[in-house]
Regions:
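Short N-terminal helix/helix-N-cap motif within the alpha/beta-hydrolase-1
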Residues: 97-101, 128
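A short glycine-rich, Lys/Arg-flanked "PGG" loop and its adjoining helix->strand segment in the class I
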Residues: 101-115
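Conserved class I S-adenosyl-L-methionine
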Residues: 118-139
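Hydrophobic/aromatic residues located in beta-strands of well-ordered beta-sheets
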Residues: 47, 116-118
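Acceptor-substrate binding/catalytic loop of class I
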Residues: 142-158
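Conserved N-terminal segment of class I S-adenosyl-L-methionine
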Residues: 1-82, 86, 100-103, 135, ...
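A short SAM/SAH-binding and catalytic strip from SAM-dependent methyltransferases
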Residues: 88-97
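A SAM-dependent methyltransferase catalytic signature shared across enzymes that methylate proteins
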Residues: 159-174
Length: 212
């Protein structure tokens, strides 16, 4: 996926995780605003965006209700308290220096019963383990689980811990982008009582509600 495709990706597979009743939504790392545009068109939601790259943020501004160009981690962006029904973090938390602090901050921006919906790469993904164990490779790439711009790496349990230690209750934790195991890996998984099931997924989606 080239840079332009990356910022334009609509992420339609994430739509089903966004609560149907969410009327005010904040999309952090909104790219060119495609996911937010889909939410506005299909749900009639009010969608705000935050995008680090100014040129991309300017494109999103033509699609969303309000867009901030800047870094959510630095405190340069001021968001209203208790305003959003849902905050979206599609493949963005792993790029942050301190995602725990950002998630803790976002709790005050949510309305009662508001949720954070995120997708996070799975470092225990089958292809990563295969390269590491069999090929002795840990190779950073331009995209994917080992994107060279990722600062944090999570397993399924790590995703749960990330949210719980940041003051959230995990409502949904589900794998997406499933791969097929080779017969050898299926056999190994069976011998281990299916303890490798989580390695089928390149990402996990977490829906979490802020603790009161």
């Amino acid at each position: 996926m080239n840079t332009n495709q990356y910022y334009q990706h609509g992420r339609e597979e994430m739509l089903r995780f966004v609560p149907s009743g969410a009327t005010t939504i904040l999309d952090i790392g909104c790219g060119a605003g495609e996911f937010g545009r889909i939410l506005k068109t299909r749900r009639g939601s009010e969608v705000w965006g935050v995008e680090l790259v100014p040129e991309v943020a300017s494109v999103a501004a033509g699609k969303l209700d309000r867009v901030f160009a800047g870094n959510i981690e630095t405190g340069e962006i001021t968001l209203p308290d208790g305003y959003f029904d849902c905050v979206i973090c599609n493949d963005v938390l792993e790029h942050m220096v301190d995602p725990w602090r950002v998630l803790s901050m976002l709790r005050s921006k949510l309305r009662a019963n508001g949720v954070v919906v995120s997708s996070i790469p799975n470092i225990r993904y089958f292809q990563i383990l295969k390269d590491l164990v069999v090929r002795k490779k840990w190779e950073y790439k331009d995209n994917g689980v080992l994107d060279r711009t990722h600062l944090r790496f999570f397993t399924v349990n790590g995703v749960r811990d990330l949210f719980e230690t940041s003051g959230y209750q995990v409502v949904t934790l589900e794998g997406i982008d499933k791969c097929d195991f080779s017969w050898k890996f299926k056999l190994l998984n069976g011998m281990l009582l299916n303890r490798l099931d989580d390695t089928r997924y390149s990402k996990f989606v977490c829906v979490a509600r802020a603790n009161v």
